Curated annotation (Swiss-Prot):
It comes from Mycobacterium tuberculosis (strain ATCC 25618 / H37Rv). It is an enzyme of class 2 (transferase). This is Hypoxanthine-guanine phosphoribosyltransferase. The lineage of its organism: Bacteria, Bacillati, Actinomycetota, Actinomycetes, Mycobacteriales. The gene is hpt. Keywords: Cytoplasm, Glycosyltransferase, Magnesium, Metal-binding, Nucleotide-binding, Purine salvage, Transferase. It catalyses: IMP + diphosphate = hypoxanthine + 5-phospho-alpha-D-ribose 1-diphosphate; GMP + diphosphate = guanine + 5-phospho-alpha-D-ribose 1-diphosphate.
């Protein structure tokens, strides 16, 4: 689903007032996000239902901390097949608004994924550099299958050599926050996704 521009400006009294003046506009409302997650859950369930029945194993959702935590929680409830969670933290950001391309593992998986059907759950794919590295890393651990689901995809992601099976929204190249997405650990608690006023990070 393509989103070409911000859907509305922030007006006084909205939850953006948690951070007065920081949110420039709303890109995706909470209702739009939840409706799309329901669609993704149904699609994923249809794709994995037979595999789950054949292998007798639950679909393993590998979530990249911290931004995707809210997304994977809602997504798992929308997928009509049993799922399990694994968490991994990698970083290529620091406190900037663009990917550095330098990836380091902050937290690795707690279990072996050999022979498992794995779905990587991402919050946003921008340059695709982090996801490309993560996909190679997990592939080397010999899962039965490996696919990617991201809530948001930015234009530059098309240049990454990674197939993304499930995309929530294609969005512009704006720096976005909310619904788990942060800038310097702030704004994750917003129920919607909005664009950050450039004065915050310039």
């Amino acid at each position: 689903m393509h989103v070409t521009q911000s859907s509305s400006a922030i007006t006084p009294g909205q939850t953006a007032e948690l951070y007065p003046g920081d949110i420039k506009s709303v890109l995706l409302t909470a209702e739009q996000i939840q409706a799309r997650i329901a669609e993704l859950g149904e699609q994923i369930g249809n794709d994995y239902r037979e595999l789950s029945a054949t292998t007798g194993q639950d679909l393993l959702l590998i979530t990249v901390l911290k931004g995707a935590v809210l997304f994977v929680t809602d997504l798992a409830r929308a997928i009509p097949v049993p799922t399990q969670f694994e968490f991994m933290a990698v970083s290529s950001y620091g406190s900037s608004t663009s990917s550095s391309g330098v990836v380091r593992i902050l937290k690795d998986l707690d279990r072996d994924i050999h022979g498992r059907d794995v779905l990587i759950v991402e919050d946003v794919v921008d340059s695709g550099l982090t996801l490309s590295w993560l996909s190679r890393n997990l592939t080397s651990r010999n899962p039965r299958s490996l696919r990617v689901c991201t809530l948001l995809r930015k234009p530059d992601a098309v240049h990454a050599n990674v197939e993304i099976a499930y995309v929530g929204f294609d969005i512009p190249n704006d720096f976005v926050v909310g619904y788990g997405l942060d800038y310097d650990e702030r704004y994750r608690d917003l129920s919607y996704i909005g664009t950050l006023d450039p004065r915050v990070y310039q």
